């Protein structure tokens, strides 16, 4: 019984992560607007804590996604799912 519960919880977690990633991708492609709340999950935005905390220290075209010691991306860059995206 514990095994089935664990499998169910892990499956739900994977589905939530997949749905959030798909919503993020659609937002980047401008298919949905960030203020769209009809998706079932709130879209990820700049105010979420983990947005730039993963690896926004990556450099894109020689420039960092965010300045050293800064909490948010700057210079027209946005950190999305471990990738630097030009806004």
Curated annotation (Swiss-Prot):
Contains 3 disulfide bonds. Two different connectivities are observed in similar proteins (C1-C3, C2-C5, C4-C6 or C1-C4, C2-C5, C3-C6). Its main location: secreted. It comes from the Eukaryota. GO terms for molecular function: toxin activity. Residues 1-23 form the signal peptide. Pfam families: Toxin_20. GO terms for cellular component: extracellular region. This is U1-theraphotoxin-Ct1a. It comes from Coremiocnemis tropix (Australian tarantula spider).
């Amino acid at each position: 019984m514990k095994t089935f519960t664990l499998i169910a919880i892990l499956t739900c977690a994977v589905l939530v992560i997949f749905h959030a990633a798909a919503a993020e991708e659609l937002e980047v492609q401008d298919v949905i607007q960030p203020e769209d709340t009809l998706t079932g999950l709130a879209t990820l935005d700049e105010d979420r804590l983990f947005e730039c905390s993963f690896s926004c220290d990556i450099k894109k075209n020689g420039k960092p996604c965010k300045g050293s010691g800064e909490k948010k991306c700057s210079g027209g860059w946005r950190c999305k799912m471990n990738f630097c995206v030009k806004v």
